[in-house]
């Protein structure tokens, strides 16, 4: 595990302990059972593919450790509706506060504003966080293989699947991919950003994507800014993209989302 992830795990463990004191697991489980049913994250992505379109997971992201504040006028419901209008298939909402200035309330508000399925984008270290995600309405959670051993990843995945949620399994090298393929979830996210150096290159996806079985659903993450980037990754059968920063920096998020996806729409028109 990188030094960055080790520091994150330390503060997440403190957060989890405090949350368990404030809301015991039994109470959280009751809230999760009463939450609105999961909307089907993977289903929404595959529906876009079936229509011949790229599938966009659009990220609601206020800040990041490497870039600082990304969007000052940060309004999750407004941004969520803008993404939906622009053609996004799903949403990703940062809920980590220390590193990303995120919050669970942002996810709740974004989901309530749209009909799109929502990923709780956070660092998962404990199954308590999975139940917490479902209790707040999440449709999907993230597993970062670089942050977990195999047993912990399997436990967190099982808790999510048992709750009716989907799981995005994130990897950024061959060893993590081999471990991820032992899990049950179809979604494999290839993070083009090295978590140790923060260097970002689409070559990471290009080298790893051909190693993933065809029945899996590949997601390209990080370093994706233009229609040309989408086209480049589509050459290695990546048809789903998680994009945040480049869209969050735009004044007109709906127009920017449409523009990002426009090449695919143009290609579809040309083929008709």
Swiss-Prot record:
Species for this entry: Bradyrhizobium sp. (strain ORS 278)
Q: Which GO terms are recorded in the biological process aspect for this UniProt protein?
A: L-tryptophan biosynthetic process
Q: In which pathway does it act?
A: Amino-acid biosynthesis; L-tryptophan biosynthesis; L-tryptophan from chorismate: step 4/5
InterPro entries for this protein: Aldolase_TIM (IPR013785), Indole-3-glycerol_P_synth (IPR045186), Indole-3-glycerol_P_synth_dom (IPR013798), Indole-3-GlycerolPSynthase_CS (IPR001468), RibuloseP-bd_barrel (IPR011060)
Q: What is this protein called?
A: Indole-3-glycerol phosphate synthase
The yes or no answer to whether the keyword Amino-acid biosynthesis is present is yes
Where are the coiled-coil regions? none
Between which residues do disulfide bridges form?
none
Spell out the family assignment given in the record's similarity comment: Belongs to the TrpC family.
| Reaction catalysis annotation | 1-(2-carboxyphenylamino)-1-deoxy-D-ribulose 5-phosphate + H(+) = (1S,2R)-1-C-(indol-3-yl)glycerol 3-phosphate + CO2 + H2O
Gene behind the chain: trpC
Electron transport: is it a keyword of this entry?
no
Q: What is its EC number?
A: 4.1.1.48
Which of UniProt's keywords are assigned here?
Answer: Amino-acid biosynthesis, Aromatic amino acid biosynthesis, Decarboxylase, Lyase, Tryptophan biosynthesis
Extract the NCBIfam families matched here. PRK00278.1-2 (NF001370), PRK00278.1-6 (NF001373), PRK00278.2-4 (NF001377)
Q: Which HAMAP family match?
A: IGPS_B
Provide a Gene Ontology MF annotation, just one: indole-3-glycerol-phosphate synthase activity
Superkingdom assignment: Bacteria
Recorded hits in PROSITE patterns, A to Z, give: IGPS (PS00614)
Signal peptide annotation: none
């Amino acid at each position: 595990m990188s030094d960055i992830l080790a520091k994150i795990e330390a503060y997440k463990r403190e957060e989890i302990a405090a949350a368990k004191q404030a809301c015991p697991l039994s109470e959280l489980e009751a809230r999760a059972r009463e939450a609105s049913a999961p909307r089907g994250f993977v289903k929404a992505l595959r529906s876009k593919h079936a229509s011949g379109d790229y599938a966009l997971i659009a990220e609601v992201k206020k800040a990041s450790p490497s870039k600082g504040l990304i969007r000052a006028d940060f309004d999750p419901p407004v941004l969520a509706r803008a993404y939906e209008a622009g053609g996004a298939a799903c949403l990703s909402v940062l809920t980590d506060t220390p590193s990303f200035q995120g919050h669970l309330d942002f996810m709740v508000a974004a989901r309530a504003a749209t009909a799109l399925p929502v990923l709780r984008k956070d660092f998962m270290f404990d199954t308590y966080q999975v139940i917490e995600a479902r209790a707040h309405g999440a449709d999907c959670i993230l597993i970062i293989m670089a942050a977990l051993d195999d047993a912990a990843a399997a436990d967190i995945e099982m808790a999510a699947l048992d709750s009716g949620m989907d799981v995005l399994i994130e990897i950024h090298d061959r060893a993590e991919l081999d471990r991820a393929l032992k899990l049950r979830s179809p979604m494999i996210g290839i993070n083009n950003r090295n978590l140790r150096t923060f260097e970002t290159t689409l070559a990471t996806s290009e080298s790893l994507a051909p190693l993933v079985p065809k029945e899996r659903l590949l997601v390209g993450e990080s370093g994706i800014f233009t229609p040309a980037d989408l086209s480049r990754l589509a050459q290695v059968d990546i048809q789903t993209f998680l994009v945040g920063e480049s869209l969050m920096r735009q004044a007109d998020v709906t127009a920017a989302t449409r523009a990002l996806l426009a090449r695919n729409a143009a290609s579809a028109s040309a083929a008709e």
